Amino acid sequence: ETAAKNSQDAAAQSESAAAGSASAAAASATASANSQKAAKTSETNAKTSETAAANSAKASAASQTAAKASEDAAREYASQAAEPYKYVLQPLPDVWIPFNDSLDMITGFSPSYKKIVIGDDEITMPGDKVVKFKRASTATYINKSGVFSVAKIDEPRFEKEGLLIEGQRTNYFVKSNTPAEWTSTSNIDKTNNGVDEFGFSYAKMRTKDNMTGQSSALSLHTCSASRGIDVSGDNKYCTVSCRVKAPDGLRCRLRFEKYDGSVYTFLGDAYLTFGTLIIEKTGGAANRIAATATKDPVTGWIFYEATIEAVEGETLIGSMIQYAPKKGGITEAGDYIYLATPQFENGGCASSFVITTTAPATRSSDMVTIPTENNIYNRPLTCLVEVNRNWGDIPPNVAPRIFDFSGVPPIESITYAFNTTEKYYGQLYMQTYKASTSTYVSSVFAGRTDVRKFIGGFNIYSDGTKRVVSNGEATKTMKTEWTGVKTRTFIRIGGQATSGTRHLFGHLRNLRLWHKELTDAQMGESIK
């Protein structure tokens, strides 16, 4: 019985072991199947990766091809685009003077001296590319930040339009920069005065309470005709100017009078209405008065000027700057005009402000020169320069100069200047000498009379013809006998003599000369 029991137990154990072996075999089969599946997946992934790599290589090749095509297209476009400009781009000038913020030349020859600052020391240094500049007095100007500035003797004045070049002028308003001492009527309160943030000395010229309800004008500064400008000689023009501000509707009146030695006579007025900047002229001499007003959008000051032309029999002319109430109205309590830089001068346009004390004061002429030596020799000769004239309908003198030569025989001379005849005033011409007829021959005039700012130039060609250019518009060519300059002398820029009788009264910048012929496209520069 016991043996039978043991035999049953052994059989049970053997059955259990067989079941475990079957279970293990099933697990092994499952693992084998999973392994085969994983291998298949790995093979699939490998093929996918291989396909992706192939596609990436194809994309890279396509990208390189596209980049090469784009590069070729860009190079071709640049070549085509540049083709016309090979006739526009100018060669390096033989003489190049920027006149932007110094007297330094980029190319050309002019031995002179300039001042440089090293630390706290100012040193005068020699150089062979420095434009010569002289002026026997101080002078004022508006710097490139719009600030009123004073230049020392022989110091050039660079404004936003370039180098300012003016002739001699005298301001007949005394104490012109001392507002508290201006010769105003007693009915004006000028105690509120000072210097604004742009450096202008001003006074707030306020009407006193006793003038409320009145309609008369009131003087703010005066130059009596008995102490005024002598117009009995060659000079027939007088110009009064100032900077003003006031509430809209009020008016500033510029008045002219004459004096014959015993009697003062009213000539004419120019009324400026604040807000609209409309100018109205009245009086018997109204048709002889030209007036303009321009507002500076930054400082707010309105530069107001009026010029009168004297007629036969008039000897002394004076002027007044005045407050006037609204047109058709009366003075209201607290009416005022801000006034700065009053000037009354001999000439057909306003010039830079001249500071005076107890007597009229004169600003000397700006004299700008370079030698002809190593700068101008023979033809061909080409010139371009940026010009800004500060005068309008009335030229400051006969033929204001851009440049000419000093003391040369007529056959060597060149005069590049403005025409001042009534029909062509403000247009450019270039004059040379014709030995065969012993006459000076001017080119056809170029430019518009109403344009003050432009790029001017001229050509003297190898074939003995010449022409003038203004803002890219050229005149027809004409014959010239000019062949060159042999005399060692000076090129006078923007003026002729210290008397100021041929001065520009304006600005020059970027003066260039070439000893070669430029194409029409290269001469086509223009500005507004």
Regions found by a protein language model. Name each.
Residues 2-90, 94-97, 104:
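Extended alpha-helical stalk/coiled-coil segments
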